[in-house]
Amino acid sequence: MEKKFYIGCVADDFTGAGDVASFFVKAGLVTVLYNGIPDDGHTVAEGTQAVVIALKSRTQDRVQAVADSLRAFGWLLQEGARKLYFKYCSTFDSTKEGNIGPVADAVMEKFGYPYTILCPALPVNGRTVEKGKLYVNGVLLEESSMRNHPLTPMRESELGRLIEMQSRYKGISMAGKTKEQWKKEQETLCRQEGHCYLIPDYYEESHGKEIAREFCDITFYTGGSGFAEHVGRLLAEKAMADRDADVDVSGEACGKEEACGKEEAC
């Protein structure tokens, strides 16, 4: 079907959904927020540019979290989403067993996305990723107050290990690697295992913009609300260009035509 809106986001709780919706609005996107998956027959209003669905998958059992998330992402695609975003907390927490990996795995497998990125950071709130490790106000996640959270305890700070504890696929830290190096590693893992995760460092606000531009050609993102704003700004640029020209301007949207060679790239 004809693509109707720029990005569809599934958030793992209502608070996070409200946060990411507000960041999309801040980025300049006309945004609609749903509490739960809309009923059959409901259609996204004309002119909508971003759609956010709030679930309860952060603390659900794994099977239900995956099932609900796939239904939500499927509905977004059916309604015409060009890109997908899985929003989770900036401290990367879910249940003790972990729901982030299973949900992201399932989305990549079901919809055919070879890899995605993990971007939980929100530097303005002290959540940063440096050398592949997640910090809360300068303290490693495992040493922060999240360590003994009653519902979502976090006792590991390295995102590669965190995702591999939950996922069937490996996480690749991009820290200290050239683009040629991490790209080769990603392509090798995807060829051997089918899917993988890339983990960029993100400890300054400017990094979010750089990451969004570097990965403007992928369809499925995962991260916190802060990174969603940077993705949203790129898409808002594209929306403005589309309105002005009504032609294929995908290269303009991310500023690097060679990475985005077709209309849906950005």
Regions picked out by a protein language model, each given a short descriptive name:
Residues 23-27, 70, 135, 212-218, ...:
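Short, solvent-exposed amphipathic alpha-helical segments in soluble enzyme
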Residues 11, 55-57, 88-90:
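Short glycine-centered, acidic/aromatic-flanked micro-motifs in structured strand/loop junctions
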Residues 16-20, 208, 230:
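Short glycine/serine/threonine-rich phosphate/pyrophosphate-binding segments
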Residues 48-65:
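Short, structured active-site "lid" loops
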Residues 3-5, 30, 49, 65, ...:
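Cap/lid and interdomain-hinge subdomains that line or gate substrate/regulatory clefts
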Residues 7-11, 116-118, 198-199, 220-222, ...:
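Short, hydrophobic/glycine-enriched beta-strand segments
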Residues 216-258, 263-266:
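Acidic, glycine-rich loop-and-beta core segments that form the ion-binding/anion-interacting portion
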Residues 2-47, 67-69, 121-124:
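N-terminal basic/disordered segments at the start of proteins
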